[in-house]
Amino acid sequence: MERHPASASSRQELGRLLEAVLTSRGQANAVFDILAVLQSEEPEEIEEGVRTCSRLFGTLLEREELFVGSLPSEDTALAGSQGATYKYKVWIRHRYHSCCNRLEELLAHPTFQVKELALKTLMKFVQLEGAKPLEKPQWESHYLFPRTLFRAVVGGLLTPEDDHSLLISHFCEYLEYDDIRYHTMQVATSIMARATSQQPEVSLTLWNNAFTLLSAVSLPLQECELTNFYVKHAQTSDKWKVVHLKEHKKAFQEMWLGFLKHKLPLSLYKKVLVAMHDSILPHLAQPTLMIDFLTSACDVGGAISLLALNGLFILIHKHNLEYPDFYQKLYGLLDPSIFHVKYRARFFHLADLFLSSSHLPAYLVAAFAKRLARLALTAPPEALLMVLPLICNLLRRHPACRVMVHRPQGPELDADPYDPTEKDPARSRALESCLWELQTLQQHYHPEVSKAASVINQVLSVPEVSIAPLLELTAYEIFEQDLKKKMPESVPLEFIPAKGLLGRQDDLCTQFFCLS
């Protein structure tokens, strides 16, 4: 939709009203005319009204002309016997509240420029109201933050009606401030809890908005004093929770646990699990509290289970969590479809990581090597070029499994003891089998696959082959590589020159036949 700037006359009128209110309290009623512009149906006029309100109440907050303390009702204050200054401050603070309420409504305006300007103005008021509090401190050095106003801002972002992902991305610029980040986590936790308590079925839009905001919150990894505040204070106190990283971690943990305890759509499950290992677990006060969520996700199956294993592995490896079924879950994910899923590269990267320990029992590694080899028989070439080096790496790490490569007294192929239907790798009898699948793949039609499968015909080198460059290999890339191969300038031909069709020396045909 085409936008037209507000007319010069309307800007001049708003400027005149602004100057009148700031110059003389006798002209205070002009505030109503300024606030009325916020109700306009023209986005350009609303923007001018928001800018005017920003300058007006920003100046009044700096001048400390708003009532401080528990705000009485407007009628009670005006009917009382207090002085004119008291009544004016109460009255102007009520107008300030009316302005903030309207700005909160504008966060849902259909025009993004209006929403963005309303957000910036509200955050400006948060900063000014924090520097010049509208409530009296309960004790000396009491930490004051405009929680009520800030809750309205975050509440305007986490709504079930509108997708605010773009507006939230602009709000995320404020999350670099320690106090904004801390209070955002607290307020978001409260809003999500209230939304789910009021209605059993929460809209997908609210969950998407919540995830967009939550995933943007990041904490420092190292313990440090937090002093980068959006609301400036003359001096900070060690008694304030907002200055301690451990309190931020507690708030971060409560926020995510409050989000993940609800039934989420599969699309959000995947997004959360993708971010779990590097954006969520490192910042939790007690990472092991995620075990219930991750084990439940592991039981879902498919890509959800695949992504949940990474978080479980971190809990096992770094936090000494016991989860005996981990490798059985991983083994169960190995089926023919794994070569065609969206997260194939991520899965095999993680599988390589999970199987990297040299302390794993030989029977377990043998089961994975055998399952991968069996799946390789029907895998596409781009997957084979990744899987075959992975199998060889498993044999390099675990010499006890190399018996599977060459077993002179092994069973016939039709009597392979390996049971591909067994879900428990310990009972699959893979170590009694052999990797005949790799010898079969040496006859593959693609020369690179045949070459990769032929590596087991020789002594395996000590250094492993990195599969990282092969994880995201595609059929298109293989085709392009084949096209770019340079052929030798001279093609090798027969070394004895031909003299006619039957012209070779000692050719029996020339002795008994004559072509004439």
Curated annotation (Swiss-Prot):
Keywords: Membrane, Nucleus, Transmembrane, Transmembrane helix. This is Nucleolar complex protein 4 homolog. Belongs to the CBF/MAK21 family. The chain crosses the membrane at residues 296-316, 347-367, 375-395. It holds the Pfam family CBF. It is a multi-pass membrane protein. It comes from the Eukaryota. It comes from Mus musculus. It is found in: Nucleus membrane; Nucleus, Nucleolus. Its main location: nucleus.
